Structure formats: C-alpha cells, structure tokens
Amino acid sequence: MFKVIICDDERIIREGLKQMVPWEDYHFTTVYTAKDGVEALSLIRQHQPELVITDIRMPRKNGVDLLDDIKDLDCQIIILSSYDDFEYMKAGIQHHVLDYLLKPVDHTQLEHILDILVQRLLERPHSTNDDAAYHTAFQPLLKIDYDDYYVNQILSQIKQHYHKKVTVLDLINPIDVSESYAMRTFKEHVGITIVDYLNRYRILKSLHLLDQHYKHYEIAEKVGFSEYKMFCYHFKKYLHMSPSDYNKQSK
C-alpha cells in the first residue's frame, strides 16, 4: 500500500536498497528509484510516496534543494550522507527529516527505522473505509519478532513458503513441535491463527504483484492459493474490495 522513492546518483546504492531491503514486510508495495533530485521530484509529484530516501550530494539538484521543493508535502524523509557531508546535513535539519543514515547503509538500522515508521503510518487517522480495512487486515503482520521461539520459527516458515500450497502441518513439521501446541502458542502470542496469518500475508504479497499488473489468476498462483476463487474470496474478506477494485483505485 505504501510507496517509497530512493534517490541516489550511485546506481549500486539505490539498486542495493531496492533489492536488499524486504520492503513488502514493511507494507511498501511499490519502490521507485531516481538518479538525481530532478528525477526524484518528478516521481514524488506523480506518485505521492509516504517515504523518500535521498542522498545529499547529487548532480542537477542536490538533496537539500529537493527537500526545499517538497517541504509542504506529507511524506517522511531519510537522508543518506557521507562523513564529509556535515554542512549539508545541517542545512537539512530545518526540514525535520525522519533520520540520517551514513553510507554504506546499515540495512539493520534502516529496517529498524522502517519498523517504527510503518506503525506510525498505520496509526494515522484513516481518510477512507479502504484505508481502515487495510489497517485492520495487516495490523497483525506488523510485529516481526516475538519472545517465543516456536512462533518466530512459524513466521519464518510462512515467509519462506507462503507461495506454495502449504498446510499448517507443512509449516510446523520442520520445527519439531506438536501441531496442537504450535497452534495454541501462535494464537496466544499473535492473536490470530496460523492459517489466518498465512492468508493475510499472501494477500499482502499479492498487492505488489497487482501493482505490477500481473493477471489475477497468475497472482493467485504466485502467492499460494489453490484456486483463483479462493484468492478473490480472501482478498475481499480482508480488504473489503475485489482485486479489480483495488486496481482501479490504484490508477
């Protein structure tokens, strides 16, 4: 549902951030990249992202100038910088950026920031019923680490195998725990059943594929539903709209 724009004149950095960060786990279904501030500004105006990650030193339009251009927009900013960019960083302080990250980017640090940001985004007042449905559907997926070993192992199995036609038994067999204990413990810690979590996670993953304009029957197969009808049923169950309605809304 959320969108992010990554702006850096070094291709290896912007593509690295795009590919290495598990954006969908943080509800960012669309990731755009730009090689300078001019490209970024065009993308920002066109797509209205919730998050912009930008370098400071860039050709044509630097990061500080970009911040000036988007200061009135409702989006969060993370600045990328080198050790010798302190003067530029001071100039960006007035824009109340979300955080600063030094290059090379520590992905663990970035994911910690994203974890906090996505909770903040999902806690915002909802402007439409569709936003509220999204919040309700994916709220249980926000927490990605629990105190219980078996719960964390089940979550890991879901994220590795959601695209397959798996059962609860398939997910817990590698963990060496009884089915009844696993189901009871998961429900106690997460608040929903393993099957419910699996289906919500599949629907979350399907949003990224919908944004890429895959056919709906292809998406159903790619996220692990045995039938197209089951994909549509669960999509409407959680988001209160059909996949086709979602496509229309996203245009």
Curated annotation (Swiss-Prot):
<dbReference type="InterPro" id="IPR018060">
    <property type="entry name" value="HTH_AraC"/>
</dbReference>
<dbReference type="InterPro" id="IPR009057">
    <property type="entry name" value="Homeodomain-like_sf"/>
</dbReference>
<feature type="DNA-binding region" description="H-T-H motif">
    <location>
        <begin position="169"/>
        <end position="190"/>
    </location>
</feature>
<dbReference type="Pfam" id="PF00072">
    <property type="entry name" value="Response_reg"/>
</dbReference>
<feature type="domain" description="HTH araC/xylS-type">
    <location>
        <begin position="152"/>
        <end position="249"/>
    </location>
</feature>
<feature type="modified residue" description="4-aspartylphosphate">
    <location>
        <position position="55"/>
    </location>
</feature>
<dbReference type="InterPro" id="IPR011006">
    <property type="entry name" value="CheY-like_superfamily"/>
</dbReference>
<dbReference type="GO" id="GO:0000160">
    <property type="term" value="P:phosphorelay signal transduction system"/>
</dbReference>
<keyword id="KW-0597">Phosphoprotein</keyword>
<protein>
    <recommendedName>
        <fullName>Uncharacterized response regulatory protein SERP2406</fullName>
    </recommendedName>
</protein>
<dbReference type="GO" id="GO:0005737">
    <property type="term" value="C:cytoplasm"/>
</dbReference>
<feature type="DNA-binding region" description="H-T-H motif">
    <location>
        <begin position="216"/>
        <end position="239"/>
    </location>
</feature>
<comment type="function">
    <text>Probable member of the two-component regulatory system SERP2405/SERP2406.</text>
</comment>
<dbReference type="GO" id="GO:0003700">
    <property type="term" value="F:DNA-binding transcription factor activity"/>
</dbReference>
<dbReference type="Pfam" id="PF12833">
    <property type="entry name" value="HTH_18"/>
</dbReference>
<keyword id="KW-0238">DNA-binding</keyword>
<dbReference type="InterPro" id="IPR051552">
    <property type="entry name" value="HptR"/>
</dbReference>
<dbReference type="GO" id="GO:0043565">
    <property type="term" value="F:sequence-specific DNA binding"/>
</dbReference>
<keyword id="KW-0963">Cytoplasm</keyword>
<dbReference type="InterPro" id="IPR001789">
    <property type="entry name" value="Sig_transdc_resp-reg_receiver"/>
</dbReference>
<keyword id="KW-0902">Two-component regulatory system</keyword>
<keyword id="KW-0805">Transcription regulation</keyword>
<keyword id="KW-0804">Transcription</keyword>
<feature type="domain" description="Response regulatory">
    <location>
        <begin position="3"/>
        <end position="118"/>
    </location>
</feature>
